[in-house]
Amino acid sequence: MPLHNLTRFPRLEFIGAPTPLEYLPRFSDYLGREIFIKRDDVIPMAMGGNKLRKLEFLAADALREGADTLITAGAIQSNHVRQTAAVAAKLGLHCVALLENPIGTTAENYLTNGNRLLLDLFNTQIEMCDALTDPNTQLEELATRVEAQGFRPYVIPVGGSNALGALGYVESALEIAQQCEGAVNISSVVVASGSAGTHAGLAVGLEHLMPESELIGVTVSRSVADQLPKVVNLQQAIAKELELTASAEILLWDDYFAPGYGVPNDEGMEAVKLLARLEGILLDPVYTGKAMAGLIDGISQKRFKDEGPILFIHTGGAPALFAYHPHV
């Protein structure tokens, strides 16, 4: 088995049973293509989401190092920060979050509702900054201040997206391959590509487990030119950790994130409404709505390699719907 080295890494259990992989009959009829969805939005902790897969590895490493505090960063409405804070609460750890307002809004819902509301429920210590211009350096500086207060901090990068955290999505690729075996031959997999860990982990895992399937990353914050090196660097770092080769081409579509990260667009919001009305499944305005807009347009523009079944990776994020209301 090519991914046997995964078992070498300490890992906590936050997810339990494999998340559902479901066929979407009404959505498939609407698009004229077989569409399946991987439901990481229903992971049974803190309203779910993809970062919990990464945090299984990262939090295990934090405990191994004797940390009593998790430190991370993101937007005010960061799903990653919300999930990190929940993990800290579950493990009896302190959590410090460095937050920015990337869209410069003064809207009350954005500043206080959705994920930001949940941070208060998890008793998160909030530190605001003007912008996360150099988040790794800013997190290290924050960790130094927290350590000076007597804590033992463990820094988790934005999105949990380092080689260790991204192992969670190599593990997810294993889960997907097992669920598809003998049931469906997936031609294409679509995922939102942001901090790059989810995309890169899937790239490594699927290359070895489902090599005939293409993986499309729909960018949510950057052009292909800016996003590609992030994904490739993580892909290679993961492969090194697992003592594997990773040579699969990284495919990115950057036509769907405008006008920028965290700013909803019409195509993304139409995708949110469509899946809600046809399947009762909630996407979000920042990540999955834009990624689904890419899937929908990709079918109409014949951008996929063939007309076979497509798997959409639902990474979660529904709490943001409340934060972006009434603009949703």
UniProtKB/Swiss-Prot annotation:
Q: Which UniProt keywords apply?
A: Lyase, Pyridoxal phosphate
Locate the N6-(pyridoxal phosphate)lysine modifications and list their residues: K51
Q: Which cofactor does it need?
A: pyridoxal 5'-phosphate
Enzyme nomenclature, EC number: 4.4.1.15
Pfam families, per database record:
PALP (PF00291)
Recorded GO molecular functions are:
D-cysteine desulfhydrase activity
Q: Which reaction does it catalyse?
A: D-cysteine + H2O = hydrogen sulfide + pyruvate + NH4(+) + H(+)
SUPFAM superfamilies registered for this protein in UniProt: Tryptophan synthase beta subunit-like PLP-dependent enzymes
**UniProt xrefs under Gene3D superfamilies:** 3.40.50.1100
Superkingdom of this entry's organism?
A: Bacteria
Task: Tell me the InterPro entries matching this sequence.
Answer: ACCD_DCysDesulf (IPR027278), D-Cys_desShydrase (IPR005966), D_Cys_desulphydr_bac (IPR023702), TrpB-like_PALP (IPR001926), TrpB-like_PALP_sf (IPR036052)
The UniProt entry's GO biological process terms, in alphabetical order, are:
D-amino acid metabolic process
Q: Which protein family is named in the record?
A: Belongs to the ACC deaminase/D-cysteine desulfhydrase family.
What is the annotated role of this protein in its UniProt record? Catalyzes the alpha,beta-elimination reaction of D-cysteine and of several D-cysteine derivatives. It could be a defense mechanism against D-cysteine.
What subunit structure does UniProt give? Homodimer.
Name of the protein in question: D-cysteine desulfhydrase
UniProt source species: Escherichia coli O7:K1 (strain IAI39 / ExPEC)
